[in-house]
Amino acid sequence: MRSFRMRNLLSRVKKKTIKNRNRNRNCISITKELAHLVEQEEEEVNEEGFNIKSSAPSHTHGVQPLGNLYLNTSSTNSRDTGLGNLHTLTDELVLDILGFLDSTSLGVLATVSKSFYVFTNHEPLWRNLVLENLLGGFQYKGSWKSTYVSACYPSFDNFAIVLGGFKVRDFYSDYLFQSWLCANLEMKPEWLERDNVVRKRGISVEEFVLNFEEPNKPVLLEGCIDNWGALRNWDRDYLVRLCGDVKFSVGPVEMKLGEYFGYSDQVREERPLYLFDPKFAEKVPKLGDEYEVPVYFREDLFGVLGNERPDYRWVIIGPAGSGSSFHVDPNSTSAWNAVIKGSKKWILFPPDVIPPGVHPSPDGADVASPVSIIEWFMNFYGSTKNWKKKPIECVCKAGEVIFVPSGWWHLVINLEESIAITQNYVS
């Protein structure tokens, strides 16, 4: 069994080669720009336009970018000395192997060396343990490890929190540092400046079909959901009163809405979980009553499928930094996305242009891309300025609706806590 799992692991690592090569190549330049970040964690940092959020904590375990090791020639990397013969493995492969361990084994391994202490405390390992073992039945405690310990070993709760922040000297890792960096980096102003989407207000259905739907072009529509009850009513307090104890789909689990907001208030991670539920109107009929399909999208051939229709509408709630990396909507569908609260940054590429840093498989079933949305902005956004076919970009605000044509690649990131409804359709 172990050999089978290892073969499967090595197969997965091979599939990630392109993604990792891009991440590591770009990380070298980033760490040179940000090599002094760790020494100035408590201050506002501005290096080549990169700014760390004012509320950002220092790296919990003192991990530094590899560029700092190059600047400190008298130092040795405790990452390598602490891993022994395993030091030749990439950081990601080490973490993939540790992902096979349970919580007790991780705890024991953390005592072996400083290096294993850092690796076994990597938050995504504990996030996976929480989601796999506790499903959605947890209250977030500021970190995934503290959440797991609090739920499974209540008597050790405070003790674990105290021990969770030991700093290790002379530990250098681009992979681990960039994970922290992506979780705490502010969006650069230049990432938000470009707004080249066509905006329309009050156009007829015929104009929409002729100028946008038939030629398969994006458009941002203003004023077409002004009569929604959702636009007037849906804020956090209203939703918690209405359905705070109702469970909604959040990543691979279901969570009560009130507990999800407790998570989103505290979370500081590279890929925040966001609520994305296709059955919201069935679970809470009043939510379905407080919106209607905008007039431009009511001709929907999916309707002939009746109860056999695949999931087609979702409520989306998430904190700043959450969102969707580049993808194409399934089943040759188009989509509309209406922002009810907050704001979202959109980037769209036409079907014949694959976004930089994105590597779809030949059949399109799998897509290799940067680990997080912020990582894509850091490493690839700048290159689009020189492309002949530039992406369509915009910030979609509350009360606005964006039309995403069939086959278009699109990325979206919440700039603040946001609530939206999206629906796929075929016309």
Please give the residue ranges for each predicted region.
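N-terminal accessory scaffold of Fe(II)-dependent oxygenases
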Residues: 2-401, 409-427
